[in-house]
Amino acid sequence: MIFARYAVTLALCASTSTAFVAPKNAGHGVQVVASSERVVSPLMTSTLSKPETETSEPSVMRPPINLKWDKIAEQLVNVFGYSQTEVDMYAGEVDNSKETLMNIYKALQLNRGFENACNQQYMQGKIRGFMHLDNGQESIPALLDYAIKNGDKKYSYYREHTHALASGVDGGAIMAELFMKETGTCKGAGGSMHIFDKPTYFQGGWALVSEQLPYAAGAAKSILLDRKLGISDNEKYEKHDVAPPSDDDRISVVFVGEGGAQNGRTAELLNSAAKDNLPLLLVVIDNGRAINTYTGDVATNGAVYQQGIHYGVPGLLVDGQDAADVAKGGKAVIDYVRSGKGPAILQVHTYRFNGHSPADPEHERGRKEEKAWARVEQDPIKIFEDKYTANGVFTEDELKEMKKQVLADVKAMVKFADESPMPPVELAKQLEYPDAPDTDYNLKPAPAFADAVNARTISPEQMATVTAHIEMLRNKAKAGDISIGDAINLAIHEEMLRDPTTTIHAEDLQAGSSYDIPKLTQQTYGQIRAADEIIDEGHFIGKALGEGMNGYRPIVELMNTNFGIFGMAELSSAGNTYATTGGQFDMPMTIVGAGGTAPNQSLGAEHSQPFHAYVMGIPGLKICTAASPAAAYGITKSMIRDNGPCFLFAPVKMMKEAKGTVDLDVCAPLNKAALLHKASDASVAGGKAVTVLTYLHGVKEAQLVTDEIMAEGFDIDLIELRSLKPLDMDTIRKSLERTHKVAILDESTLTGGVGATISARISEELFDLLDAPVRRLCMDDAPVPYASSMEVAVVKRGSDLVKGVFDLITKKY
């Protein structure tokens, strides 16, 4: 893709002393040469300017940019490559159409009226929690209403009421959601910050600043996947074997504030969008306030629309107080993305008339004064009214009548919400998982289109290669010679062939990563389904979330599960999505990787963290472990078929050494533990048996000392906790009914660890079965040292289990 337009990319910067050179033949690898001075566009001087001292602070910290249409048109010609004739066409479609101008005005009034009603209802206590209003920024949803289509994917942040309205989401349902009512968009499960609507592809409503950016990239990727695989959504929004139309021009639109755009996720988004030529539009809502802090106080780059230059992503700046100009310029940028030329940025300079939320005291420097000034001087509705009554397009009576109609609609929305019922209490638990914990994944049918899609996307040579690879692994599995990593790889290939909507993301994917988990996936399914990713787990977990919301089944392989720390926000939202959306959006996602802490691991603290314990508190996640090839294979297959997010932890030091047979073509349950060794009846009768609960490397440690325990006349029920969440209390109960004593060999810390949770549940639910306190053998709270001489004090092993069992039986504990 050629961006010759960057040859003149900022003729607009000519007035600055900073040199800016971009080669005429610049594509995604565009090179930028600049002096040591920072590049500042004169278009952005009001955004970036700061007062020299507190005493010299002007009455308006952020003056209007007064960016007229001729300058916007100049950007479209110089940066986006439009001809002047094309630019004039975009202007004419708005300026010469009274109907279009009427629709823009109605959208402005609808969004203002809706937000005012929300504020009133909030003050009356009918809307609860956090709420963030959009007053003053109405030109942006008006653009949505004008130029965005129903099939486009829309991702917003927590200030999204108006974006949902403009996307066609029913206003009564939005208001009902804010009222916590069952008729709300998400049945009252989401609230103000989490508006979702599947029929209009309005996909949030995300509460963590900038988290929505990689999700939107994943949604854009799903559009490319549809086109590549030749599948599309049916009337139930499920994939079927009908190719998107030849003129499919869907895009993904994502909104972020200029403060949120300083987040590193923006750079990752631009890189990903440019690399894959995603049909993605980044809309930057530039109100000059990062929450309420003046953005210039915390960020040196207010010209977010220029951030894409280094990636070959063009940007446009518009004045958000002129709704007609926003519609003209915004439509041109949207059409640029629709045409397949790649991603783009639209920055809208605007003012927010309200505080961050209704409860905000707004103590930040200059905020109250700016707000009062902007309401008088920079109201986009008043500016529109003055402009189009002065030039005779509308009479005051016409405007009043349109406003009256819109406010009547808003009143009806409030009435609908107020009269709607509250959701039933049992709905909360029903929304925990899309698939019940006891689901039999063997009964889930494969997509009917699998063979057809495989035939048109995998060449005969590729199919022959992967078939031979699968057969080789299956023979190893039958012979008991397959490793954990290879067993997972086998399951992944079988599932990717069974269901072509399955995708995979990983670092070093082409090379098979560290344990061959994604081996041969890109060589077989191509880069569109098997993506090598940048070194940021949060980014590609986020992209997987966006794919999962849009009909795909992403797999994420973590080279080491501890690297998932970079993706905690995305993991949290993956777990919450099904419930938060009121059950509208399934969230299939399989995360798999090697982790845990083995004795004598010698990897140091960062690679030895109990990440499985960290994610235990995330609602909606199913968390499993696998210490054998059989468990790894069966669990992986089930997770890929599950409609919710699942996380499989495998033991890092056993990935290649542990070998065994596999029950081929069988999905394992995701809610069951496994009894690996059963104590003899004689030991149970003599009170010399103990239930041992463990997982990951603890399984091997326990197996290594079982003979030693038995040699002393004792015995154990050895239970592998293959499901940490949900926890299999039935298997634990059945064992304790025999042994009445339990030891937990735990690969997590004393405080907040897995063993702490299990111990608490046993004490609460099975206390009457215990003859002794629960014996926890867990990691110390200290970081895991590199040196083995110190590590022994932190990480428990087989010898600790022997002592723990002996102490329980001899009543020394």
How should each PLM-predicted stretch be described?
Residues 595-644:
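Internal gly/pro-rich beta-alpha loop/helix module
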Residues 40-140, 354-356, 361-525, 770-813:
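Conserved acidic/glycine
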Residues 116-120, 124-277, 296-305, 310-312, ...:
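Cofactor-binding active-site loop characterized by glycine-rich and histidine/acidic residues
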Residues 2-49:
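N-terminal chloroplast transit peptides
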Residues 142, 201-422, 503, 516, 520, ...:
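Thiamine diphosphate
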